[in-house]
Amino acid sequence: MYSFEDLKVGNSFIEKRKISEKIIKSFAYASRDRNPIHLDEKFAKKTIFKGRIAHGILVASFISSLIGNKFPGPGTIYVSQNLIFKKPVRINDIVTVKVSVKKKIKRKGWCELLTTCLVKNKIVLEGIAVVVPP
């Protein structure tokens, strides 16, 4: 766990997550997002993606998991998150999740975090989170 005082601009934390069939199905069940682009290969082959893709918000949830569990860690409060989805993520892809301290807002005790997800060193999702560290 990292407090506001512990965090320095440029500090970062990285973890890797694998997209599996089970994770996609579990997310579809929990979120009730059963869009066939995620679940039906026959349907998905006819789309611009030419196959099934993971839910974008599933991939984004890896950022939330890293922030809430590891960096800054338990007790962190999410204030906001913006996201840009740049490329699709597919079953069996290994997602590298990176969170870096971009800016500290001392008067509020907030941090801006650069949030990035990559597959094979290509950015698939990026954005900025604002958090209150524990």
Question: Which role does the model predict for each range below?
Answer:
Residues N69-D93, V97:
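Mid-chain, well-packed structural core segment of small domains
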Residues N35, G73, K87, V132-P133:
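Intrinsic-disorder/low-complexity coil detector
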Residues M1-T76:
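Hot-dog-fold acyl-thioester-processing enzymes
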Residues Y2-V9, V89-P134:
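HotDog/MaoC-like acyl-thioester-processing domains
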Residues I37-H38, F49, F62, I77-Y78, ...:
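Short, intrinsically disordered/low-complexity patches at protein termini
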Residues I14-K18, I84, S100, V130-V132:
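Generic structural detector for well-ordered beta-strands
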